[in-house]
C-alpha cells in the first residue's frame, strides 16, 4: 500500500504491531524511514512494541496551517492510541494498567540526532504510584524523573541545565558519584524539585493529563522539523524536497527492570571492516539513552550470550531475517525487558569505504544480492576514502584541532611546514614530508605543490587553483582557512593562538578541513582485492567512458592504474612550469619583440614539449590522448612580486632592457584576464605558438609509433566562440601535420576538436561541428561565463547564497543542470545534427562529481574526463545511473 507519488493520502495515522501493520518499507516518503521500517519489521513477524505513525503529510499540513493541527487529526491520533491500548491490555493514564509511550520523529531520510524524542510519556503522580506498585519505587520514580527532564526540555523548551543542576546538587549533598546510586526516596524528592522547575521556568505547572502530554509531544516533533539544527543539517547534507517528519508513537519497553533486562545497539556486520559478524554494544539493566549518553561503559555484544542466552539467540536470528529481507547491512536498536526481546529500530547502517566494498562483494558471493544491486550499495564517497591515506584514529586528535578550512581535496597529510614552493621541492628532495602553507597558490607553485604531502591556504574556495590541482593529484588540501595568517617574509603562520615556524609539524584532514597540531599517525590507502572485483562489475554495467585529466607521464600512469580509458585533457601549460629552463624559454617567447626572436624561444621549448608528449603517449599505449593547446593568459607565466622585481628578473633571464620589459608587462596586463587574451586568441595572434605545439605532438606521435606504441592523438583548441576561430587553427594544425608527415616519411591518424566553454559556442555548435571532430565541454569556464561568476571570487558570496537557499549547490562543484546543463544538451544535439559521429565529452571538475556524471550519462555524452584519483568515482557514478 505504497502511497501514490502525487496527491495526498487520506489516511494520516498508521498502526503497527507484531504480525499486523498498515504500512511497509516502501512508504518512507509518507511514514518516514523509522516508521516504514517499524511497520516492515512488525509485518514480517518480529517482536516490535506496538504503536502508530502520524504521517509526514500531517506534518506538512501542520506547517502549511501556520503550525496548527489539521482538522480531524487529533481524533485520528486518539483512535491510534485506543488500538495500542487494546493490543497491550493497558491504558494511558490508568494507574492499575499503566501504558507508557515513546514519541519519536522520523523523516524519509535518516537525520541522526537532528530531531527530538520523548520517553516515558504518560507518567503523573497517580500513574507513577501505580507503576511503583507493579515494578518497584526506584524504577517508577527514576522513569518519572527522566520523563520530566526530557518532556520539559523537548516539549516545554526548558533548558536541560535547570534539571541537571537539581540532580548534581542532590548527588553532591549525598556524596554520590553516579545517578544509579540515588535511592527511591532521593528520586521522589527529585521529581518534586523537577516539577518546581516547570513553575519557575514557565509560570505554570507540569501538565499531568497524559493525553495533553501526548498532544504537546506530537506538536513538538512537528515543530522540531523547522528547528535551526534540523534546517542546518538538511542544508549541509543537501536534503531537499521532503514533506516533513513523521511522528512515531510507540509502547515503551524497559531495559532497566533488573538483571534480566538490558538495551543495546548493533550492526549486522562490522561497519569499519565489513566482517560478517555482529558488531555492537549491550548494557544490562539500562535504558537506551544510557548507551548513547555514555553514562556507563557498555559491554561487547558477545557478553549478552552469557547473561541472556535465549534473547541473544532470538536476536541473532532476527538479524539474519532482517539482512535477508532488506538485502543490506542493518543498524539495529533493541531492548530486553525481563528476558523478552523487543526490536526498536532498524535502518541501513552507515559504514566506511573499506566496509562498503567488502559487504557488497560478500553479499553477492553469498547469493544475497545480484551484482547490479551491489553496485548501488557503495557510495562514491566510499571510494574516495579508499583512494587516499587516512588518519588511524581521527577521534584521538580532536583536542589538537587548531583551525578548520574548506575540505578541498580529501585524505590526510602530515609534514613539516614550509612557505615557498622552492622550499617544498628542496625539502622533499631530501626525503622530508612537507605541508606547503600559502596565502593562496598560483600556477608557479605547482612544483612545490607536487612535492608537498598536503597544501594549506588562507584564501581560495573549493574550486580555487590549489583545490583543483590538489584533487587532480589526489593530494590532501585544506583551502580558504580564514583562521590562519601567513607571513611569508618571516616564514611563520599564526593559527588561532599558535605560531608555527618553518619545520614544525602539522597535520591536515582534507576530508573534514581540520588543521591539526603535531604529527598524527596515518594509515595508507586500503586498496583490497575486493575493490578490484567490485570495479570489474561496475565496468561491465556502465556505458559512459571515463578518461582522465593528466599533464605528465606520472599522472597518465596513475590514471591508467585507476582504470582510465584514455586522457581527456592534457594541459600543455603545466609542462612549462616543470623546470627553470622551460619557464625561462616561455618568458623569452613572451618578451620577444619580433617573430624571429619568438621563434627562437619556441624552438627551445619544442624538444621539452615533444619529450613530454612521448612520455604520455607511451604511458597511454593503445588509448586516446587529448592535448589542449595553450590556454591561460601569458601574464600567468611572468614572475611573481611587485613590478620592479618582475622587471629585474625578466631582464636577467631574457636579456631584455628595463624599458622593453616594463612596456611588455604593461601590454600583458589585463582588467579581466579570464575573458581576455587567452586560448585560441593566443594561437591566432601568434600562429607560431600553435605551430610549435602541433609539431611537438605529431613528431612525438610518430616517434612513439616507430617504437611500436599505439598512438591516438587528439588536438583540442581552447576557448573557441566562433567557427572562424576554430577554422583558423584547424587549417594551421593540418598544415603542420602534412609537413611533419612528409619530413618523417610516415602518416598517423589524428583528430582535431574544440573545448565548448563559451556560451556562444554552445549556441552555434552546429556550425562549429562542421570543423570539429569532437567537443569537450570545459564546464569550469562554461559555468563561470553562464552565471557571470568569477571562479576566484565566489567564496565571498556563495556561502551566503547556499545558507539562504538562493542556490542549492556551489555550481563549480555540482553541475547546474537547469542552466549550464541545458547548454550542454543543446550543444550536443546541435553538434550531432551537423556531424552525426561527433564524439562528445566533458573535462571540467564536474567530470568526477557523481550527480553531474549521472546527468552527462543521461544526456548521451560519450565520456567524462576527471582527475586521475576521481576516475574510480566517475566509473561508479556512470554505472549507478543504469542500475
Curated annotation (Swiss-Prot):
Its cofactor is Mg(2+). It catalyses: pyruvate + phosphate + ATP = phosphoenolpyruvate + AMP + diphosphate + H(+). One of its GO terms (cellular component) is cytoplasm. Residues 1-21 are annotated as: Disordered. It holds the Pfam family PPDK_N. Keywords: ATP-binding, Cytoplasm, Kinase, Magnesium, Metal-binding, Nucleotide-binding, Photosynthesis, Transferase. Its EC number is 2.7.9.1. It is an enzyme of class 2 (transferase). InterPro entries: ATP_grasp_subdomain_1, PEP-util_enz_mobile_dom, PEP_util_AS, PEP_util_C, PEP_util_CS, Phosphohistidine_dom_sf, PPDK_AMP/ATP-bd, Pyruvate_phosphate_dikinase. Its main location: cytoplasm. PubMed:1668653 shows the existence of a second gene coding for both cytoplasmic and chloroplastic isoforms of PPDK. This is Pyruvate, phosphate dikinase 2. It comes from Zea mays. The lineage of its organism: Eukaryota, Viridiplantae, Streptophyta, Embryophyta, Tracheophyta.
Amino acid at each position: 500500500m505504497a502511497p501514490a507519488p502525487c496527491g495526498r493520502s487520506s489516511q494520516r495515522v498508521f498502526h503497527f504491531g507484531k504480525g499486523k501493520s498498515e504500512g511497509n518499507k516502501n512508504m518512507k516518503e509518507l511514514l518516514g524511514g523509522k516508521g516504514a521500517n517499524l511497520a516492515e519489521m512488525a509485518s514480517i513477524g518480529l517482536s516490535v512494541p506496538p504503536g502508530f505513525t502520524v504521517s509526514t503529510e500531517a506534518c506538512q499540513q501542520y506547517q502549511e496551517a501556520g503550525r496548527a493541527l489539521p482538522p480531524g487529526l487529533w481524533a485520528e491520533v486518539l483512535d491510534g492510541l485506543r488500538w495500542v491500548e487494546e493490543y497491550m491490555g493497558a491504558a494511558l493514564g490508568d494507574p492499575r494498567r499503566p501504558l507508557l509511550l515513546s514519541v519519536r520523529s522520523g523523516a524519509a531520510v535518516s537525520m541522526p540526532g537532528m530531531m527530538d524524542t520523548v520517553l516515558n510519556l504518560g507518567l503523573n503522580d497517580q500513574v507513577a504510584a501505580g507503576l511503583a506498585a507493579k515494578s518497584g519505587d526506584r524504577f517508577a520514580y527514576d522513569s518519572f524523573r527522566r520523563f520530566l527532564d526530557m518532556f520539559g526540555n523537548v516539549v516545554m523548551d526548558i533548558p536541560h541545565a535547570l534539571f541537571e543542576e537539581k540532580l548534581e546538587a542532590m548527588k553532591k549533598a549525598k556524596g554520590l558519584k553516579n545517578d544509579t546510586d540515588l535511592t527511591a526516596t532521593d528520586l521522589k524528592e527529585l521529581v518534586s524539585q523537577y516539577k518546581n522547575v516547570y513553575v519557575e521556568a514557565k509560570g505554570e505547572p507540569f501538565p499531568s493529563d497524559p493525553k495533553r502530554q501526548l498532544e504537546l509531544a506530537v506538536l513538538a516533533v512537528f515543530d522540531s522539523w523547522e528547528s535551526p539544527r534540523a534546517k542546518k543539517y538538511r542544508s549541509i547534507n543537501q536534503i531537499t524536497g521532503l514533506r516533513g517528519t513523521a511522528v512515531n508513537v510507540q509502547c515503551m519497553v524497559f531495559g532497566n527492570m533488573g538483571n534480566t533486562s538490558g538495551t543495546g545497539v548493533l550492526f549486522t556486520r562490522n561497519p569499519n571492516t565489513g566482517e560478517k559478524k555482529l558488531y555492537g554494544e549491550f548494557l544490562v539493566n539500562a535504558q537506551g539513552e544510557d548507551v548513547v549518553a555514555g553514562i556507563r561503559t557498555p559491554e561487547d555484544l558477545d557478553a549478552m550470550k552469557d547473561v541472556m542466552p535465549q534473547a541473544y539467540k532470538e536476536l541473532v536470528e532476527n538479524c539474519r531475517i532482517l539482512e535477508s529481507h532488506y538485502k543490506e547491512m542493518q543498524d539495529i536498536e533493541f531492548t530486553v525487558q525481563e528476558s523478552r526481546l523487543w526490536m526498536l529500530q532498524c535502518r541501513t547502517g552507515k559504514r566506511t569505504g573499506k566496509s562498503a566494498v567488502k559487504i557488497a562483494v560478500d553479499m553477492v558471493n553469498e547469493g544475497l544480492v545480484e551484482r547490479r544491486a551491489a553496485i548501488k550499495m557503495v557510495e562514491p564517497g566510499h571510494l574516495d576514502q579508499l583512494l587516499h591515506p587516512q588518519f588511524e584514529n581521527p577521534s584521538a586528535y580532536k583536542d589538537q584541532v587548531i583551525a578548520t578550512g574548506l575540505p578541498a581535496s580529501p585524505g590526510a597529510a602530515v609534514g613539516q611546514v614550509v612557505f615557498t614552493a622552492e622550499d617544498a621541492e628542496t625539502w622533499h628532495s631530501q626525503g622530508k614530508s612537507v605541508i606547503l602553507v600559502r596565502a593562496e597558490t598560483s600556477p608557479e607553485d605547482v612544483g612545490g605543490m607536487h612535492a608537498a604531502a598536503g597544501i594549506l591556504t588562507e584564501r581560495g574556495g573549493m574550486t580555487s587553483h590549489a583545490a583543483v590541482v590538489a584533487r587532480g593529484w589526489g593530494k590532501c588540501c585544506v583551502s580558504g582557512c580564514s583562521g590562519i595568517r601567513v607571513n611569508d617574509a618571516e616564514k611563520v603562520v599564526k593559527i588561532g593562538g599558535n605560531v608555527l615556524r618553518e619545520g614544525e609539524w602539522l597535520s591536515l584532514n582534507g576530508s573534514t578541513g581540520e588543521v591539526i597540531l603535531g604529527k598524527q599517525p596515518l594509515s595508507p590507502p586500503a586498496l583490497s582485492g575486493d575493490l578490484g572485483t567490485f570495479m570489474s562489475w561496475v565496468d561491465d554495467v556502465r556505458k559512459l567512458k571515463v578518461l582522465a585529466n593528466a599533464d605528465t607521464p606520472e599522472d597518465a600512469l596513475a590514471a591508467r592504474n585507476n582504470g582510465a580509458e584514455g586522457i581527456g585533457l592534457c594541459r600543455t601549460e603545466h609542462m612549462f612550469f616543470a623546470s627553470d629552463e622551460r619557464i625561462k624559454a616561455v618568458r623569452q617567447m613572451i618578451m620577444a619583440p619580433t617573430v624571429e626572436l619568438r621563434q627562437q624561444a619556441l624552438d627551445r621549448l619544442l624538444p621539452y614539449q615533444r619529450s613530454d608528449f612521448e612520455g604520455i603517449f607511451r604511458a597511454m599505449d593503445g588509448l586516446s590522448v587529448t592535448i589542449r593547446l595553450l590556454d591561460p593568459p601569458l601574464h600567468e607565466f611572468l614572475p611573481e612580486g611587485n613590478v620592479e622585481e618582475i622587471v629585474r628578473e625578466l631582464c636577467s633571464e631574457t636579456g631584455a632592457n628595463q624599458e622593453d620589459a616594463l612596456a611588455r608587462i604593461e601590454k600583458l596586463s589585463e582588467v579581466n584576464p579570464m575573458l581576455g587574451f587567452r586560448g585560441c586568441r593566443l594561437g591566432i595572434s601568434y600562429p607560431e605558438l600553435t605551430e610549435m605545439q602541433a609539431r611537438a605532438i605529431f613528431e612525438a606521435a610518430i616517434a612513439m609509433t616507430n617504437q611500436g606504441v599505439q598512438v591516438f592523438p587528439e588536438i583540442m583548441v581552447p576557448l573557441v566562440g566562433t567557427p572562424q576561430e576554430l577554422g583558423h587553427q584547424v587549417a594551421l594544425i593540418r598544415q603542420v601535420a602534412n609537413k611533419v608527415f612528409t619530413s618523417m616519411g610516415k602518416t598517423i591518424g589524428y583528430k582535431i576538436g574544440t573545448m565548448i566553454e563559451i556560451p556562444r559556442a554552445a549556441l552555434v555548435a552546429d556550425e562549429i561541428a562542421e570543423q570539429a571532430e569532437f567537443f569537450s565541454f570545459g564546464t569550469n569556464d562554461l559555468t563561470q561565463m553562464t552565471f557571470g561568476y568569477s571562479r576566484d571570487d565566489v567564496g565571498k558570496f556563495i556561502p551566503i547564497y547556499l545558507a539562504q537557499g538562493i542556490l542549492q549547490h556551489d555550481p563549480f562543484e555540482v553541475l547546474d543542470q537547469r542552466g549550464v546543463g541545458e547548454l550542454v544538451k543543446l550543444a550536443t544535439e546541435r553538434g550531432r545534427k551537423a556531424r552525426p559521429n561527433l564524439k562528445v565529452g566533458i573535462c571540467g571538475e564536474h567530470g568526477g562529481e557523481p550527480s553531474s556524471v549521472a546527468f552527462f550519462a543521461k544526456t548521451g555524452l560519450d565520456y567524462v574526463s576527471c582527475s586521475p584519483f576521481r576516475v574510480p568515482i566517475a566509473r561508479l557514478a556512470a554505472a549507478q545511473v543504469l542500475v
